Amino acid sequence: MKWCWGPVLLIAGATVLMEGLQAAQRACGQRGPGPPKPQEGNTVPGEWPWQASVRRQGAHICSGSLVADTWVLTAAHCFEKAAATELNSWSVVLGSLQREGLSPGAEEVGVAALQLPRAYNHYSQGSDLALLQLAHPTTHTPLCLPQPAHRFPFGASCWATGWDQDTSDAPGTLRNLRLRLISRPTCNCIYNQLHQRHLSNPARPGMLCGGPQPGVQGPCQGDSGGPVLCLEPDGHWVQAGIISFASSCAQEDAPVLLTNTAAHSSWLQARVQGAAFLAQSPETPEMSDEDSCVACGSLRTAGPQAGAPSPWPWEARLMHQGQLACGGALVSEEAVLTAAHCFIGRQAPEEWSVGLGTRPEEWGLKQLILHGAYTHPEGGYDMALLLLAQPVTLGASLRPLCLPYPDHHLPDGERGWVLGRARPGAGISSLQTVPVTLLGPRACSRLHAAPGGDGSPILPGMVCTSAVGELPSCEGLSGAPLVHEVRGTWFLAGLHSFGDACQGPARPAVFTALPAYEDWVSSLDWQVYFAEEPEPEAEPGSCLANISQPTSC
């Protein structure tokens, strides 16, 4: 009968393991003494028993959170310098209200081991988390961790805790800060509205963001690695994120970037013994905050169809003395880009009006700015910027189109879309979308130089298109935008200059290529919406999520 003992022992072991796991889950995430609800400002002793000060040679470097009796979770970038990996110089302080020294009842523990994700390269690239194994167990209550499928309430209030070195109010004292969780797309949208390329799309796969209350300074130096935690309905506090980095101490218009703990839960589960990964109620609804920021190049309706009416919320219809004359693209709250040749001999702003998106009304023009080097379409520089008489309010029916930076790729063979008229000379009701294939200057030059072509030189600042298929009737529209999609974001690739955009490959249409004119546009109106090309999605922690990693990754 000995063969029976194996299964019996396994079942008993599993029972003990399950009981231990359930006990850990009950114990984790229980806030200590203090007000019934967290209050903005200084904490009280023991309020957050898992709060850790990560120190090197006694000086506070980063914050962290106790997630098991021998494990502290913090940020990888705290250990980027070579000297930082000398573990005997590092320690973790638990239970202290002060950034320096030890509060009564605080405990300082040495660090026995450090674990970083293999994919970590730089905090801006993601995977910014680290595990510190303590030299001996501690009795402080740990924070709960989320399962991989955990959904946090975007737009709802969670809390960050840290010492916030830049505050003048009780410097060096542990503080509570209310943060609203912000999804990655919305966070990127907010940062892109700062119109600074080095801050473009900072939230990468495996990140989320947190925004402080209006007028309140967010996490700052020394708060890196600290927890952002949310209260679950069952009363447990769960770590939603790890403070990674911010611009200007996370002001309202520049949220703090967080490592998404749930996105790295599998990595944590494989390494942390004794941590409680809290199961979430399956009834938790999906939550979205997409409506809180209007992103350039975002299309909330069905995509374009050949020959169908335009779905573009950035479409501009230029009316000269009441007649449809040209197309264009809305690129900010008050700017439209179009072709310069539309205005030769008719440059009085009062003669023009602009229809936008799906809105029925029209806007007047305050100013017309033609590129100073423009002489004729075949000579290039066929671009103009129009300033509206009044700024528009962006929303579902009006959104700006993203402008590309000079290194934006417009590869041969890429699918694009243009606007055309269903009938020659027809008005607004005849506008339709036309699918096209992008052609670079070399391929386009060969076709224009071939028999039957017009022999026009194709300059480096141009891009060409060839219509895909045939529509029953179609005529290109001067100044109309050439748009293409990159992983869900739409960009202005070009503005129609000459040639018929409805023609096939024998006579490609020619467009002013927007990547070549970033300097000119920026010099006129820095408020336009430039955007980086979205990078390929990847599993958080994978090498693909960190494109600057060496190939050995």
Curated annotation (Swiss-Prot):
A GO CC term attached to the entry: extracellular region
Region span, Disordered: 27-46
Keyword Transcription recorded: no
EC main group: hydrolase
Active site, renumbered: H77 (charge relay system), D128 (charge relay system), S224 (charge relay system), H341 (charge relay system), D382 (charge relay system), S478 (charge relay system)
Record localization: Secreted
Alphabetized UniProt keyword annotations: Disulfide bond, Hydrolase, Protease, Repeat, Secreted, Serine protease, Signal
Tissue: Predominantly detected in testis, liver, heart and ovary, as well as in several tumor cell lines.
GO molecular function: serine-type endopeptidase activity
Secretion signal span: 1-23
Gene3D superfamilies in UniProt: Trypsin-like serine proteases
A GO biological process held by the record: proteolysis
Disulfide bond entries: C62-C78, C158-C230, C187-C209, C220-C249, C326-C342, C444-C464, C474-C502
Residue ranges of every copy of the Peptidase S1 domain listed in the record: 24-273, 294-526
Matches recorded under Pfam families: Trypsin
Annotated EC: 3.4.21.-
Family: Belongs to the peptidase S1 family.
Function: In vitro can degrade the fibrinogen alpha chain of as well as pro-urokinase-type plasminogen activator.
Protein name: Serine protease 53
